[in-house]
C-alpha cells in the first residue's frame, strides 16, 4: 500500500464540508493508501480543528468523528530528519514526515508546498488531483 501525507488544512476542509473533495481525498487515503502522521502534524490538525473561527461550523461531534477516523487508520511515525526546504518553515514538518514515511505524495492546498513539487521524488498535489489519481489507479467508477 503506498504511503501518503495529508496536511492539516485538507483535514480541516474535510471536516468542514461532508462529501467535499477534501473529505473524499481523506477517505480515499485511509482506504487505498497508508496515511501517515507525526506528532507535530497531529498537533497542528488538532489546533486547526479547534480554532474559534471553525467552532460555529464544526461541532464537537464532527471533530471527534474526523479525529477518530484518522487515529483508527493512520500510522504514526517519528521523523528523524529535520528539513529546512520550504518557503514557510511551518510547512517543513510535512517534508520531515513524508521522508520518514517514504510517502509518494503530500496532499495539500498550501501554495508553498505545491510550488515545490516534485521534491525529492515526492509529489505535492491538491485534493482534487489526489482523488483523480486514486480513482484512476484503483479504477473507481466516476
Name these PLM-found stretches.
Residues 26-82:
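PIN-domain endoribonuclease scaffold, especially VapC-family toxins
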Residues 88, 104, 111-142:
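Acidic, PIN/NYN-like endoribonuclease modules and their adjacent C-terminal/linker elements
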Residues 72-105, 111:
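Active-site neighborhoods of divalent-metal-dependent phosphate/nucleic-acid chemistry enzymes
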Residues 11-12, 42, 54, 113, ...:
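A generic structural signal for short hydrophobic patches within well-formed alpha-helices
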Residues 20, 36, 58-61, 85, ...:
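Residues at secondary-structure transition points
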Residues 12-14, 54, 81-87:
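Short, flexible loop segments at the rims of nucleotide/cofactor-binding pockets, characterized by
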